[in-house]
């Protein structure tokens, strides 16, 4: 059989040296489909080569011929450039073979055999190098092909480490522990060989203001933030008719609740320009009031208002809320169904204080300290209940403009939601252009709105936040809804908290007055002079004046331990309010100037706080 395959020779012993080295012999061996026969023929030829004393030359020639055949099948071998599917530029690859089958190199074994070592089983290449404008961190955009081209941006340190590069598989590459080293080397070679042709760009991890420009309304800057936030970044876009949006929304703005939601949305990019702080606008009330749809209308200023895009449910942690706010930076944060995120203790105080600080806490990884994230945006929330409680701290109360929806925000919710899902994003760019062109006037206008609110009983923080909403509303009205009257002080006054409503000491004292009123038996004996149950103190009443102007002053001696306990159960701290109580006369000091009185109440000696009611 061997003789038949190798020509007319009967045995391998009759093969001459020229015939042994001929292309026909090599071809007939390699074309044999049966591996057993192919190996047998090759071994017979090697034995004949030994007899002719040319074994080494035969072996070299045979493997050279085999490699030459492989080269024909491997498009790109020896050319030093990529032959990837269309859609990406051709790059230099050096000794790497880069084609539709992936990226690999050919390694020759000591026995002369050659094997393919794959860095990637799919086409992959660096398509851009980036430097983050805020941090200076170098990043690389990788493009990879799996039925179609995909791209993702990674820190350069990630693609430079055998262990870290495996993380790129989360985004679709085929990096694994087996090929990691080769893939790192291939990408490093590509970056070195193509340093003068790969585009170098500036990147940023957030939206909003940057060096006087507003992302994403700026060309030439790429978003390099976490991939989880890419849908939000991409949602800042346009769809549908600008004119139809203005006409439709003009009618909706006759509702004061929607007007305030849109005013807060317009105010968000103004905050850093006018020196204002982040604030919360919270609309609450029963279901089917149209609060969520109103939120969508307010976010349609900037882009796609659908849930999961510019609007999101609050099924997220406080930390996630802060990192999302840092990514938005100056674009408003819109969160629906706030009650989902309620703290275990039953309040939202931590959320409010965290988002209104505008700075995320520092965090440290094992190898580096994370960048301190900041934001300066408005937070638009909706829910079924108030965001603050009677026991909420003054800081939380102060930072929230909280509005109970006693009527509907949107009358036809389904129709309106459908409309803004198909018409959105046009107003944002024009609004930012106006801000840039009129930057010098903004602080003056802001000051004017603050002055219009000075006659209203409210705290400074409430006044400053509402003035920002009024400024945003006024600019929005003039740009998109000409002829519309801007919000006035009378329009917004019902939604501002008075100083007393914000003052935690005043709220705590009112609470204790109610406790005393419904627990009179804890302070007073019955008609027989007996006390039953726990004794909390005593009440001394002083009556003065004449008819009809008789007045009664009640002095309540309240057991210190019980007072602290009752306040704490309601969410107040005695130590936080005692100084204010003493200052305004609600609490009387003893003759030594101390807050506590050592006295007897119904025969029981103890330490008491004297409250004037």
Predicted segments — roles?
Residues 294-345:
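AAA+/P-loop NTPase substrate/partner-engagement loops
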Residues 349-363:
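Conserved catalytic/switch belt of AAA+ P-loop NTPases
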Residues 337, 376-386, 404-407:
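A short beta-strand-to-loop transition that corresponds to the Sensor-1 phosphate-sensing loop
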